[in-house]
Regions:
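N-terminal leader/targeting and accessory segments in enzymes
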Residues: 1-102
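Conserved beta-strand termini and adjacent loop/short-helix elements that scaffold enzyme active sites
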Residues: 19, 23-25, 93, 146, ...
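Phosphate-binding loop of NTP-binding sites
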Residues: 98-230, 234, 240-250
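Short, basic, low-complexity termini and linkers enriched in Ser/Thr/Gly/Pro
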Residues: 84-87, 244-252, 266
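Adenine nucleotide phosphate-binding catalytic loops in nucleotide-utilizing enzymes
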Residues: 49, 210-214, 250-268
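Short beta->alpha junction loops/turns
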Residues: 51-52, 93-96, 149, 175, ...
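Short, polar loop motifs at secondary-structure junctions
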Residues: 71-78, 234-237, 258-261
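Conserved beta-strand segments of alpha/beta enzyme cores
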Residues: 89, 142, 252-254
Length: 268
């Protein structure tokens, strides 16, 4: 993945200052941020991630294609294999995936669009696309909608990197593969509005019950301010109410269902 990225080196360093032993005196400006060495361009910030292979292995390739700097996890052995000149381009972090989220959250907080986050056991993508269609009257640069399945800790930041001063509405899909992920994604996104589509049996092998799944989904409020709005289905709304009461939050709760006549309608 790659996205436009207009930040100075000093700005990125300031986000991770406690981990740095920085020796360079220049302050170049990045033009791109990428997790793929094959997509790296000149003036990129390369973020190596661990998957089937360790992304740190591709740091030399990214540097050969013009990367200005790269993130690197503290004490990673790849550093000892690099020249002194290339070592000087390392921005040391404790975890590259978490660092990507920190950078994305910093970018998101520079702007003030309405951000609507969608999660649930099913129907997330359809709902996200429908909401995107409802805001289709906006100019192209004013609307950002999650593309493809970019709904996890890797893809979500690249949705947020598309936000600019012209952006008025952002529709984000938040997915979940393991416990705690929705909370982390919400803290990165900081939604102004959130919608839970439903609570089904997806992930029940890990979470054991629909109630536990509902608890996990409501963690979408983790990054929401008290002026935010949460839309939830009516079948487990008692859990949502109890959670909000326990947290003593003033997030507004709107319960919806598929059966009764709606009391809210969308107008252009």
């Amino acid at each position: 993945m790659i996205a436009p990225f207009e930040y100075s080196l000093s700005t990125i360093l300031s986000l991770f200052s406690k981990d740095q032993d920085w020796k360079r005196t220049d302050n170049p400006t990045f033009r791109w941020i990428t997790t793929s060495s094959s997509e790296t361009k000149a003036r990129s910030l390369f973020v190596p991630l661990r998957g089937t292979r360790d992304g740190h292995e591709f740091i030399p390739d990214a540097l050969s294609k013009g990367a200005t700097a790269f993130l690197c996890e503290k004490n990673h052995p790849i550093l000892k294999t690099l020249s002194n000149a290339d070592q000087s381009k390392a921005i040391v972090v404790s975890d590259c995936l978490l660092a990507l989220g920190v950078i994305a959250s910093y970018h998101r907080m520079r702007f003030k669009p309405m951000i609507l986050a969608v999660t649930g056991s099913s129907g997330k993508t359809t709902t996200k696309d429908l909401l995107g269609g409802l805001f289709g009257f906006l100019k192209q640069k004013s609307l950002v909608v999650t593309e493809k399945n970019y709904n996890n800790e890797i893809g979500l930041p690249f949705t947020l990197f598309r936000i600019t001063e012209e952006t008025r509405v952002v529709i984000c899909e938040l997915g979940m593969n393991h416990r705690g992920e929705i909370a982390r994604l919400s803290r990165i996104t900081k939604p102004t509005h959130a919608l839970i589509t439903n609570i089904g049996s997806a992930h029940i092998e890990n979470l054991k019950s629909r109630e536990a799944i509902a608890e996990e989904k409501i963690d979408i409020i983790s990054g929401m301010a008290e002026s935010s709005v949460l839309f939830v289905p009516d079948d487990l709304d008692f859990l949502y109410r109890a959670k909000l009461k326990k947290l003593k939050t003033k997030i507004k709760l709107i319960v919806w269902n598929h059966k009764e006549k709606p009391n809210l309608k969308v107008k252009k």
